[in-house]
Amino acid sequence: AESEYGFDIEHAYLSLEGSFLNEKLGFFLQADFADSYPLLDAWVSYAPWKQLKISAGQKQTFTNTRQMMMLDQGLAFGEHSLMDRTFSRTGRELGLFVESRLSLGKLGFDLGAAVTSGDGRNSFGSSSTDPDLGGLKYGGRVTVYPLGFFTSGNEMVFNDFIREKSPKLAIGAAYSYNVGASNMVGEGHNDFQMYDKEGAADYPDYRKLSADLLFKWNGFSLLAEYVNATANG
């Protein structure tokens, strides 16, 4: 038999990022042209002061594990872990996001709250006949840095290419409540239909709790994560 050769493109990213007015206004756009629905991220942000940022649009949400907060190019391997792929899809949501960074001496905190569509990426479907279903998703996250903050940006990639000169540790926890999910992990819509005894649409509420730990020092990286999800209704 004759041999056949070929190759596939897993991802083909195009990213645009910028800021204005002394970094008070910002935007981020990312597309994956190897995907049938290329748009991944499209959001704008406003930072009235250094400790607070308000974003609106479709972006990587912080209500998942830390690995799901990382852009794909920041992962240790070519894809997310089996656990993260079980409990999440792309980790992107359409909505409003509020983030704050605070410090108390050497102790650091990242705080976040989000209200999103609850239907994941491209949540309003491919056409007007594929509408958003269920209610909104509410979530939040707290991350503590007991040894001080990482070098800028180094907490959002797995590998310690910067080689932190002193040990750095991030301990985080996130929770989300999705009202009326029609996707098995609350990151999609119209994947199944459920009805009450009167025949009206009745989708289950989906809750997810996660915890994670990221440690880096002098090129060494360690990431541990835990997820628990329940649905009822």
What are these regions (language model features)?
Residues A1, Y37-W43, M68-D72, S123-T129, ...:
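Outer-membrane beta-barrel translocator domains and adjoining extracellular loop/strand segments
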Residues A1-R121, T129-F149, P167-A170, Y175-Y177:
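Outer membrane beta-barrel
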Residues T143-P146, F150-G233:
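Detector for outer-membrane/organellar transmembrane beta-barrel domains
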